[in-house]
From Swiss-Prot:
One of its GO terms (molecular function) is NAD binding. This is D-lactate dehydrogenase. It catalyses: (R)-lactate + NAD(+) = pyruvate + NADH + H(+). It is an enzyme of class 1 (oxidoreductase). Belongs to the D-isomer specific 2-hydroxyacid dehydrogenase family. It comes from Lactobacillus helveticus (Lactobacillus suntoryeus). NAD(+) binds at H156, I157, D176, V207, P208, N213, C234, S235, R236, D260. Homodimer. The lineage of its organism: Bacteria, Bacillati, Bacillota, Bacilli, Lactobacillales.
Length: 337
């Protein structure tokens, strides 16, 4: 019997895993809540493929251990592949898939909601209300329709975000090295990132973590932006030089910051730190600021998205096992390792 083994299955994923099992009774499905590491790779022994999801790196040692267990067909439940040692994967003959589209709306909605909350100074108002301070001033907000919203990256998520912000009445501009023909016809694109930085009141990032994009938000780019800019990062943590953003917040150049992804999030996000020593002073500082909204990489986290991530990953893995073309194969190109 064909067997698929899944790693790092969360409680919220179990209903959708069981739904897939029920629809594929001829497949043996087993799983663990543990991450895939060199030590846990042996759990997959006897399986034909594995389904995985983690921010932890898929190192050469991890991939070797998985191959030693007889498994080289690996399906990610997420989109990001920058944490895979591609050279080692290629050497070992791995076949890898991901889920590039699971719910653009989930992430775009989160980015739009958080941006609007920053503009309205909701966190400051909530803090006042909690203290029973019901005065209006000085917590006056800005309307979305009065902003120029700059969207960096016009893929699936970026386009949904654009439509949402236009629904509020904002003027939307965009930049992408790969222009969408329909958006180009409608005149959304500016000529350069510099142009977008200079024109936008709100800047939202929707691009991948590739070397050219690392720390694209830095001291130099922030200096080019309008005074009182709002920066939104619900994409990848390494797009933002966190220290540069803190300097921009301290100077008042940046009005507010939305951060769902963080360059040092591995080992910190998705853990309960209540009553314990918090391990990251910089992150703690951002969380405590009244004009910063931090969420722990949960922009994607809806029932709709989680179901798609589980079901699509298992479908991809089964196709790999059966020698069929998967819906979203990953090219084993060299990356950061």
């Amino acid at each position: 019997m064909t067997k698929v083994f899944a790693y790092a299955i969360r409680k919220d994923e179990e209903p959708f895993l069981n739904e897939w099992k029920e629809a594929h009774k001829d497949i043996d499905v087993d799983y663990t809540d543990k991450l895939l590491t060199p030590e846990t790779a042996k759990l997959a022994k006897g399986a034909d493929g594995v389904v995985v999801y983690q921010q932890l790196d898929y190192t050469a040692d991890t991939l070797q251990a998985l191959a030693d267990a007889g498994v080289t067909k690996m399906s990610l439940r997420n989109v990001g592949v920058d944490n895979i040692d591609m050279d080692k994967a290629k050497e070992l003959g791995f076949q890898i898939t991901n889920v590039p589209v699971y719910s653009p709306n989930a992430i775009a909605e989160h980015a739009a909601i958080q941006a609007a909350r920053v503009l309205r100074q909701d966190k400051r108002m909530d803090e006042k209300m909690a203290k029973r301070d019901l005065r209006w001033a000085p917590t006056i907000g800005r309307e979305v329709r009065d902003q120029v919203v700059g969207v960096v990256g016009t893929g699936h998520i970026g386009q949904v975000f654009m439509r949402i912000m236009e629904g509020f009445g904002a003027k939307v501009i965009a930049y992408d090295i790969f222009k969408n023909p329909e958006l180009e016809k409608k005149g959304y694109y500016v000529d350069s990132l510099d142009d977008l930085y200079k024109q936008a009141d709100v800047i939202s990032l929707h691009v991948p973590d590739v070397p050219a994009n690392v720390h694209m938000i830095n001291d130099k780019s922030i200096a080019e932006m309008k005074d009182g800019v709002v920066i939104v990062n619900c994409s990848r943590g390494r797009l933002v030089d966190t220290d540069a953003v803190i300097r921009g917040l301290d100077s008042g150049k940046i009005f507010g910051f939305v951060m769902d992804t963080y360059e040092d999030e591995v080992g910190v996000f998705n853990k309960d730190w209540e009553g314990k020593e918090f391990p990251d002073k910089r992150l703690a500082d951002l969380i405590d600021r009244p004009n910063v909204l931090v969420t722990p990489h949960t922009a994607f986290y809806t029932t709709h998205a989680v179901r798609n991530m589980v079901v699509k990953a298992f479908n991809n893995n089964l196709k790999l096992i059966n020698g069929e073309k998967p819906d979203s194969p990953v090219a084993l190109n060299k990356n950061k390792f």
